[in-house]
């Protein structure tokens, strides 16, 4: 049994290496970008889950071919008291390992499940109620229509739009080639309101198209 576990552990590490390498070399998105991917982990206390998390962290720590830091997948370690936060917790060793890896590679990021805005959704024994994030920004959890569906799986961004606020600031501000003698705050907010309405209409139109797919 010990020999089998050791062999499985080695194979798992190689699988994690391949997983990370693939997600940093598959230029399959628009513009030949690699997939924007995220992995949330840290609360699985099963032997299999612990083995995967340990080897994933070790693979991140080792880096890519020339020891470069792998950017993808974005790694998020979920911290939970009673699971991995305290020395007596079953996954505390993985929490310590994640801190060591983060000190070197800047990943993983950390998601604190005991934070009040996350803990309100947490139900012991239901992993789907553990808040998960997409990369370093998107957190979709609450459901005002059906609180029973306030879960992580199947959630995310349908679409997104960016507003260039610095450009608006320069356009209506007192710096740059088109500098004004005085900041035009009314003009800034008027154009911002117009852009917000445009983004709203654009997102609703995309939503209607996506609903028909």
Where are these regions (language model features)?
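Conserved catalytic cores of very large enzyme subunits
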Residues: 1-213
């Amino acid at each position: 049994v010990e020999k089998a576990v050791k062999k499985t552990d080695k194979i798992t590490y190689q699988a994690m290496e391949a997983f990370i390498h693939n997600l940093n070399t598959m230029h399959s998105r628009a513009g030949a970008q690699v997939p924007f991917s995220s992995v949330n982990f840290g609360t699985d206390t099963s032997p299999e889950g612990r083995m995967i998390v340990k080897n994933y962290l070790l693979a991140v720590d080792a880096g890519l071919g020339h020891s470069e830091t792998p950017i993808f997948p974005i790694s998020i370690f979920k911290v939970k008291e009673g699971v991995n936060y305290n020395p007596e917790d079953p996954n505390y060793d993985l929490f310590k390992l994640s801190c060591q890896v983060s000190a070197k590679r800047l990943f993983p990021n950390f998601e604190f499940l005991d934070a009040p805005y996350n803990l309100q959704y947490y139900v012991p024994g239901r992993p789907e109620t553990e808040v998960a994030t997409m990369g370093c920004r998107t957190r979709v959890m609450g459901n005002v229509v059906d609180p029973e569906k306030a879960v992580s799986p199947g959630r995310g961004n349908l679409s997104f739009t960016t507003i260039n606020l610095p450009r608006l600031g320069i356009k209506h501000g007192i710096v740059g080639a088109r500098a004004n003698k005085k900041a035009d705050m009314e003009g800034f907010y008027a154009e911002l309101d117009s852009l917000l309405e445009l983004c709203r209409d654009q997102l609703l139109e995309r939503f209607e198209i996506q609903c028909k797919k």
